Design a protein with these regions (language model features):
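Weak global preference for isoleucine
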Residues: 9-13, 29, 35, 57-60, ...
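Basic, amphipathic alpha-helical hairpins
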Residues: 10-24, 43-48, 66-75, 95
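…primarily DNA-binding HTH/wHTH and HhH modules…
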Residues: 94-117
């Protein structure tokens, strides 16, 4: 397996913010890198902890959403959702599944922690 290929795919998805495309498809990545479905799946299985393509993209979206919620308090949750390729309800659902709390609950905890300092 070629870890350099996976690193390149991951870097491009992040730097070009491809994850923010609501309808990003596996085929878009396959075409961009000239690889087949099986090869992409092998890359994900080997270097992305066996995630499916949608799981992998959602994991990146969650990382970015977490960072934006933490470091950009001026952004609304709806703005953050759009920024990462979700609707606000999708972000709420995925964030709660991933972190055990909603984005609003997470942000409220940040704000109250700042008030206590």
């Amino acid at each position: 397996m070629d870890k350099d290929l996976f690193k390149t795919i991951d870097t491009i998805i992040r730097k070009e913010r491809l994850y923010a495309q609501v309808n990003l498809m596996r085929e878009d990545i396959m075409q961009r890198f000239g690889i087949g479905r099986h090869h992409l799946n092998d890359q994900l299985n080997t270097f992305a902890d066996g995630m499916s393509f949608p799981q992998y993209i959602n994991s990146i979206r969650m990382e970015v959403a977490y960072e934006l919620l933490t470091n950009h308090l001026e952004m609304t949750i709806t703005e953050i959702a759009r920024e990462v390729g979700f609707t606000a309800p999708n972000l709420r659902e995925q964030f709660k599944r991933c972190y055990g709390i909603t984005p609003a609950e997470y942000r409220a905890g940040l704000i109250s922690a700042d008030d206590e300092e």
